[in-house]
């Protein structure tokens, strides 16, 4: 679901061109990207399927979009979620009680063409199956694209890699990685570069958006710890929002209290201190990415033989993939030798 910090980050977000990300390493929240691919392939929001009725949208999106990123000179690392913290499971269980209501909202969002809303409800309903995740990992391996299995939250791991300088940005549509301390987040890199306006036959250009944590904190004159408390008042993946509090009110409350722990205590947020501490110190691991050579036969087996993808189209895409990866690996080699 992600935390809704849109109003808080909007004053400082910057629209950029894809070419400005040339040579940059981006740690992409894999689950977030797979949800995007799952629902953004077709305009009706319904997933693509093979001849056996199995969903293939996640593979199509992952394959072609990753190649597009590589052609822009972007070096992606996909970060997969591990074991969720126990308070996230509790939050999921509570939300499942409203499953019928969520299912209705999900279908309504699809009908209206509001894919972002549909994705939000799909996440709560658990529309991403484990076999899709495993297929995605196999495809990335075949493509020569690095991925890391996070011990817990993918966005926490992506934030850690960005803080360490392994990656230049976290790539996600959500804002959670800011709470985990990522210095920079880039949005709109795993979605189509043209988006249909809900209910209209009009397409608008979608550009990457960069949000810097320091800019957010400086604009509102708050600390990262206070930003976490604000997010908790607004509702996160781990706790329900406090009724009647919007973004501006949340900022005022946290500034008035000063100490974020006092805010959590005053509003009696369930597991509040534990959640707060988790945002500050989540489980993470070290990772050194390597971009390899594509295994053409294996890609063909996964996409064409197993899932009925068009062989000519896949063949052409593999050529693009090989060319883009060669270029990236050559540049990495040159920079290693200081050329």
UniProtKB/Swiss-Prot annotation:
Region (Interaction with PCNA): 329-337
Keyword Magnesium applies: yes
Superkingdom as given in the UniProt entry: Archaea
SUPFAM superfamilies named in the record: 5' to 3' exonuclease, C-terminal subdomain, PIN domain-like
Amino acids binding Mg(2+) 2: 174, 176, 237
Region: I-domain, residue numbers: 117-258
GO biological process, one term: DNA repair
Binding site for Mg(2+) 1: 29, 81, 153, 155
Pfam families: XPG_I (PF00867), XPG_N (PF00752)
Protein EC: 3.1.-.-
Region called N-domain, residue ranges: 1-99
Alphabetic keyword roster: DNA damage, DNA repair, DNA replication, Endonuclease, Exonuclease, Hydrolase, Magnesium, Metal-binding, Nuclease
Similarity field: Belongs to the XPG/RAD2 endonuclease family. FEN1 subfamily.
Database matches in NCBIfam families: fen_arch (TIGR03674)
Subunit structure: Interacts with PCNA. PCNA stimulates the nuclease activity without altering cleavage specificity.
Protein name: Flap endonuclease 1
Native source species: Nanoarchaeum equitans (strain Kin4-M)
């Amino acid at each position: 679901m992600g935390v809704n910090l849109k109003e808080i980050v909007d004053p400082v977000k910057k629209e950029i061109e894809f070419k400005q990300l040339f040579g940059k390493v981006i740690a992409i929240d894999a689950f977030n990207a797979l949800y995007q691919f799952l629902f953004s392939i077709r305009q009706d929001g319904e997933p693509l399927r093979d001849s056996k009725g199995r969903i293939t949208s996640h593979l199509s999106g992952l394959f072609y979009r990753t190649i597009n990123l590589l052609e822009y000179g972007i070096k992606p690392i996909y970060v997969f979620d591990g074991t969720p913290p126990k308070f996230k499971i509790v939050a999921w269980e509570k939300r499942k009680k409203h499953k019928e209501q969520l299912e209705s909202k999900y279908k309504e969002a699809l009908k209206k063409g509001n894919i972002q809303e549909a994705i939000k409800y799909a996440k709560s309903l658990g529309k991403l199956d484990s076999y899709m995740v495993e297929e995605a990992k196999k495809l990335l391996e075949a493509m020569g694209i690095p991925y890391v299995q996070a011990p817990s939250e993918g966005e926490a791991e992506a934030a850690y890699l960005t803080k360490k300088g392994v990656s230049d940005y976290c790539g996600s549509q959500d804002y959670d990685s800011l709470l985990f301390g990522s210095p920079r987040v880039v949005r709109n890199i795993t979605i189509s570069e043209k988006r249909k306006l809900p209910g209209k036959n009009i397409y608008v250009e979608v550009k990457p958006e960069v949000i810097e944590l320091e800019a957010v904190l400086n604009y509102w004159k708050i600390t990262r710890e206070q930003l976490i408390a604000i997010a908790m008042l607004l509702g996160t993946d781990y706790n329900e929002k406090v009724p009647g509090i919007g973004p501006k009110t949340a900022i005022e409350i946290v500034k008035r209290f000063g100490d974020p722990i006092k805010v959590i205590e005053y509003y009696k947020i369930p597991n509040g201190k534990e959640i707060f501490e988790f945002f500050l110190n989540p489980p993470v691991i070290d990772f050194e990415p390597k971009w390899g050579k594509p295994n053409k036969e294996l890609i063909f087996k996964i996409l064409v033989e197993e899932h009925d993808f068009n062989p000519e189209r896949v063949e052409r895409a593999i050529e693009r993939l090989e060319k883009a990866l060669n270029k990236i690996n050559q540049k990495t080699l040159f920079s290693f030798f200081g050329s």
